[in-house]
C-alpha cells in the first residue's frame, strides 16, 4: 500500500514538479516506486497512443509551447518547389518533409521493398547513401540518392531490390526466418559514372524520441563506459565515435553509427529535401549540368529557403519531445523478461541508466539546458560502437560504410526507449538500420560479432523465457 500511495502521489505531482525547475527540484528528489522508472526524468511522457513520440514534455509551456508547435508544423510541412514560404523543395530531393520519413517523429517502414517498389513517397522514407567504392562522396550529388525531382529536372537515380531469405531453428525446434535486402542502382543520372562502380547502403529513419536527452548526455559518462567496455568472456569491447561537428571534435551520440554530435535539422533539410539554410547554403546539386545557369523553371536559387529562426524552432521541437514512460512494469511476464534481459547480458551494451550534463550547461549548438540538465535517464544504450559481425547469411550487419571512426561492421547501440510503441505509432515492426528485421525476435537474431554471445544465450533459453524477454522489450 505504501508503494501504491507513492505511485499515486507521483502522478498527481508530476505536472507540478516538471514546471518548477527553477526552484532546483531534481527528478532524483522524487521517490519512485520499486520496479518503475521514469524514462527521461522530467521529460517522461505518460502517453500510450499514436502520438506518444510526437508530443511535448510536460515542462513545455508559454513561449516554449508556441515555439514547439511552430517547430512541429515546420517538421511536418510539405515543402513545395516555389519561392514562397514553405517552398524551396529540390531541385532534387529524397523526401518532401521531415514527417514524410519520420512519421509522428518515428520511423516509416521500408516500403521500397516491403511494397515491391518505391512506394508513394519515392524511397518511402529510406535514405540511400551512395559513394564511390573507395568511400569518397560524389561532388554535386550530396550524400544520398535523390530519387525525386521537381518538374523539368532529372532524379539522380533509382534502386532495385532483391530479397534473400533463410530459415533457422532454435534448439527446442521452433523455426524463425531472417531476410536481408540487396540493392542495385539503375537510371543513374551521372552518365560518366557506371552504377557498378558505386557503393550504396540503405537506412530507414530513426525515431526522434529522446533526441534532446541524447544530446544532453554527459560525454564523460560515455567515455567512462568506453574505457570499461571490455568483457572478453562475452567478446564485447565498445568504443566511442568522434566527429568534427560545427568545427569542434566531438563525441558522436546520434545516428546509426554515432556519426552526429548535434541535432541534424539543417543537414536533413538540405541533404534530404534540398532546402537551403544558413548552415548549408548551397543547393545539393549545385554543380550538376542541369543546374547550369543558376535558375530553373523560373525559380531563384540565390536566397536561402528557410530562415535560421525557423531552424531553431525545429531544433526546440526535437529537444522538447517527451519520452514515453515504461508500461506494464508490474506484469509478471514483463518482470521475468527483464530478468532474462540481464541474464543474456544485453545490459552490457544496452546500458539502462545514464545522466545528462549539469543544469546550466549547453548543447553543442549553444542551446542552454534549463530543462534537460541534471536528469537521470533510461535510454538502454551505451551509445558506443560495437562490431556486429559479418557472418550471418554471409553478410551479417556489415554494410562496408565508414562514418567517422565507425567501420562497416560497427554500429552504435540503439537506444531502446520507446521501442515497444513503434507498432502503435508507426504501424509496423521493422527494425535495424535498413528495416530487415521484421520483428524484435529477428532483430535479436541478427546480432553477431560482439552481440553473438548474448544472442546465443537468448537462443538457448526455453521458448517461454524468449517470449518473456520480447514482452519486456515491448514494455520499453
Give short role names for the model-derived ranges.
Residues 6, 33-49, 275-293:
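Short, compositionally biased low-complexity segments
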Residues 16-19:
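C-terminal motif of bacterial Sec signal peptides marking the signal peptidase cleavage site
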Residues 211-212, 225, 229-302:
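Active-site substrate-binding loop specific to GH73 endo-beta-N-acetylglucosaminidase modules
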Amino acid at each position: 500500500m505504501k508503494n501504491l500511495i507513492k505511485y499515486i502521489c507521483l502522478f498527481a505531482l508530476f505536472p507540478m514538479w516538471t514546471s518548477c525547475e527553477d526552484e532546483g527540484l531534481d527528478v532524483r528528489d522524487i521517490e519512485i516506486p520499486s520496479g518503475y522508472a521514469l524514462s527521461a526524468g522530467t521529460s517522461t511522457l505518460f502517453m500510450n497512443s499514436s502520438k506518444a513520440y510526437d508530443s511535448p514534455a510536460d515542462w513545455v509551456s508559454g513561449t516554449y509551447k508556441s515555439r514547439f508547435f511552430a517547430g512541429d508544423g515546420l517538421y511536418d510541412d510539405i515543402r513545395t518547389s516555389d519561392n514562397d514560404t514553405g517552398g524551396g523543395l529540390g531541385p532534387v530531393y529524397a523526401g518532401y518533409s521531415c514527417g514524410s520519413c519520420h512519421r509522428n517523429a518515428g520511423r516509416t517502414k521500408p516500403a521500397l521493398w516491403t511494397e515491391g517498389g518505391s512506394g508513394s513517397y519515392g524511397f518511402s522514407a529510406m535514405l540511400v547513401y551512395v559513394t564511390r567504392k573507395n568511400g569518397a562522396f560524389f561532388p554535386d550529388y550530396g550524400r544520398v540518392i535523390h530519387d525525386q525531382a521537381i518538374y523539368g529536372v532529372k532524379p539522380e537515380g533509382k534502386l532495385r531490390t532483391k530479397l534473400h531469405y533463410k530459415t533457422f531453428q532454435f534448439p527446442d525446434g521452433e523455426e524463425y526466418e531472417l531476410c536481408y535486402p540487396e540493392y542495385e542502382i539503375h537510371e543513374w543520372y551521372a552518365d560518366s559514372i557506371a552504377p557498378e562502380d558505386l557503393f550504396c547502403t540503405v537506412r530507414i529513419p530513426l525515431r526522434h524520441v529522446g533526441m534532446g536527452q541524447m544530446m544532453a548526455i554527459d560525454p564523460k559518462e560515455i567515455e567512462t563506459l568506453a574505457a570499461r567496455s571490455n568483457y572478453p568472456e562475452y567478446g564485447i569491447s565498445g568504443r566511442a565515435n568522434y566527429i568534427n561537428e560545427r568545427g569542434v571534435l566531438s563525441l558522436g551520440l546520434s545516428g546509426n553509427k554515432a556519426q552526429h554530435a548535434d541535432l541534424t535539422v539543417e543537414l536533413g533539410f538540405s541533404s534530404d529535401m534540398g532546402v537551403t539554410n544558413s548552415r548549408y547554403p548551397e543547393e545539393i546539386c549545385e554543380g550538376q549540368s542541369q543546374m547550369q545557369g543558376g535558375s530553373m523553371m523560373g525559380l531563384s536559387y540565390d536566397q536561402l529557403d528557410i530562415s535560421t529562426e525557423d531552424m531553431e524552432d525545429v531544433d526546440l521541437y526535437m529537444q522538447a519531445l517527451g519520452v514515453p514512460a515504461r508500461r506494464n512494469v508490474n506484469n509478471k511476464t514483463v518482470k521475468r523478461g527483464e530478468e532474462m534481459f540481464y541474464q543474456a547480458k544485453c545490459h552490457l551494451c544496452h546500458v539502462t541508466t545514464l545522466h545528462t550534463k549539469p543544469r546550466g550547461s549547453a548543447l553543442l549548438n549553444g542551446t542552454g539546458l534549463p530543462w534537460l540538465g541534471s536528469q537521470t535517464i533510461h535510454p538502454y544504450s551505451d551509445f558506443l560502437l560495437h562490431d556486429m559481425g559479418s557472418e550471418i547469411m554471409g553478410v551479417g550487419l556489415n554494410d562496408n560504410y565508414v562514418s567517422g571512426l565507425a567501420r562497416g561492421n560497427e554500429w552504435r547501440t540503439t537506444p531502446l526507449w520507446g521501442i515497444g510503441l513503434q507498432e502503435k505509432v508507426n504501424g509496423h515492426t521493422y527494425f535495424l538500420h535498413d528495416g530487415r528485421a521484421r520483428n524484435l525476435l529477428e532483430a535479436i537474431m541478427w546480432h553477431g560479432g560482439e552481440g553473438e554471445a548474448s544472442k546465443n544465450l537468448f537462443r538457448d533459453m526455453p521458448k517461454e523465457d524468449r517470449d518473456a524477454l520480447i514482452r519486456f522489450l515491448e514494455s520499453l
